């Protein structure tokens, strides 16, 4: 059998297959339909956002527009006054630990290099919750830990930094 006759598994193909498998597992671990339906009927979810810059701020505004309760957070929450005003009466701001406690769902929107510290600092508040990690490792910004995350797989690395959460990547 020649090399051209063999099925060649590319990195991209492998990662796509792994991604589909991971998505299937993530969906299987989502709350029961009754829980989601109850939250939907109530009209809103309580969402805590750790990191309210460009990404966290923009997503939070959209969620607020959809009627959800939003807790924006930053190490400098006094700088979020304008963002909270834009988001409306169901929005508030404070420190990251308060956002982690507040949210039924938590969005982490910080540089990937900060993820290990977020996990160490707020793991108890986020335990068992759906946590959305929207960061991506970049070696130029995040240093050697980015190389490690890329090599192991970002989802695997993130799960290690955020123990006990229901991780969405």
Identify the role of each PLM range.
Residues 2-22:
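N-terminal secretory signal peptides and thylakoid transit peptides that target proteins
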Residues 30-66, 71, 75-80, 90:
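C-terminal segment of N-terminal export signals and the immediately downstream linker at the start
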Residues 31, 87-94, 113-117:
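Short gly/ser/thr-rich secondary-structure transition/capping motifs
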Residues 60-62, 84-85, 118-123, 143-145:
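Short amphipathic alpha-helical segments
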Residues 81, 120, 156-159:
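Active-site phosphate/pyrophosphate- and oxyanion-stabilizing loops and adjacent acidic/basic residues
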Residues 96-126, 130, 137-139:
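Rossmann-like NAD(P)-binding element
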Residues 135-168:
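Rossmann-fold NAD(P)-binding glycine/threonine-rich loop
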């Amino acid at each position: 059998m020649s090399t051209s006759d063999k099925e060649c598994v590319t990195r991209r193909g492998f990662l796509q297959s792994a991604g589909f498998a991971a998505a299937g597992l993530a969906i299987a671990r989502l709350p029961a339909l009754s829980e989601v339906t109850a939250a939907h009927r109530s009209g809103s979810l309580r969402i805590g956002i750790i990191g309210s810059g460009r990404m966290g701020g923009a997503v939070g505004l959209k969620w607020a527009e959809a009627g959800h309760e939003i807790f924006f957070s930053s190490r400098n929450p006094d700088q979020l006054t304008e963002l909270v005003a834009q988001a409306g009466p169901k929005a508030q701001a404070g420190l990251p630990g308060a956002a982690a406690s507040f949210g039924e769902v938590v969005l982490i929107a910080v540089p990937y290099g900060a993820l290990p510290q977020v996990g160490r600092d707020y793991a108890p508040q986020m335990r068992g919750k759906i946590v959305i990690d929207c960061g991506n490792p970049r070696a130029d910004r995040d240093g050697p830990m980015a190389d490690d995350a890329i090599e192991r797989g970002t989802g695997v690395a993130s799960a290690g930094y955020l123990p006990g959460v229901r991780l969405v990547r």
